[in-house]
């Protein structure tokens, strides 16, 4: 067998082909190392806390509650409704910033949205929600637009506030002792 035939055989043999091609996601190189992956704790009350960002998230989103998409104004009303009800005992629920929404996202995490598509948020969040969230950030030069964050791609985008095909995942700031397990507090006591 000639060298050319041998090269052809090697190149066309499926056992010799590298079938572990890597999928490169847009923006994936910007996300950094594994230590930046969100670390979530299920609080057992319909909320999840991210110990890295000190944010508390509602486990489900507006789609799980209503069954349809909402516009930015309805997302604001949704936060207000949760605050009036004192959901999980708190009255300071709000839309996240773009950076806060991004902090819940990681390519190493996997969940599914309402259509069964993969989203990159912790499996501790309820599956079957929307694939994006409104943020509180308004476009500076054109206030009829607000920022959305995609949990599929990790991208931020500007969307008209009247767009009803978006969803809302709410958050709040937490002080560490609000959700820190009792056993952890005890282990932090040092004697001299």
Annotate each predicted stretch with a short phrase.
Residues 2-93, 165-171, 178-191:
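Extracellular adhesion/carbohydrate-recognition regions
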Residues 48, 60-63, 96, 102-103, ...:
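Generic hydrophobic/packing signal
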Residues 10, 137, 141-183:
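Solvent-exposed, polar surface segments
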Residues 71, 76-92, 98-148, 159:
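An exposed tryptophan-centered "aromatic clamp" motif
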């Amino acid at each position: 067998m000639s060298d050319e035939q041998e090269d052809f055989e090697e190149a066309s043999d499926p056992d010799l082909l590298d079938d572990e091609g890597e999928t490169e996601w847009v923006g994936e190189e910007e996300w950094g190392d594994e230590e930046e992956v969100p670390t979530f704790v299920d609080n057992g009350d319909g909320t999840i806390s991210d110990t890295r960002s000190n944010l508390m998230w509602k486990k489900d989103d507006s789609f799980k509650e209503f069954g349809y998409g909402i516009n930015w104004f309805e997302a604001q009303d949704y936060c207000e409704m949760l605050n009036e009800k004192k959901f999980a005992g708190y009255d300071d629920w709000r839309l996240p910033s773009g950076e806060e929404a991004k902090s819940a996202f990681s390519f190493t995490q996997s969940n599914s949205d309402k259509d069964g598509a993969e989203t990159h948020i912790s499996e501790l969040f309820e599956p079957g929600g929307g694939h994006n969230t409104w943020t509180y950030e308004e476009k500076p030069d054109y206030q009829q637009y607000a920022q959305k964050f995609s949990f599929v791609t990790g991208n931020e985008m500007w969307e008209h506030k009247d767009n009803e095909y978006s969803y809302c995942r709410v958050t709040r700031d937490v002080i560490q002792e609000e959700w820190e397990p009792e056993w952890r507090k005890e282990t932090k006591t040092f004697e001299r």
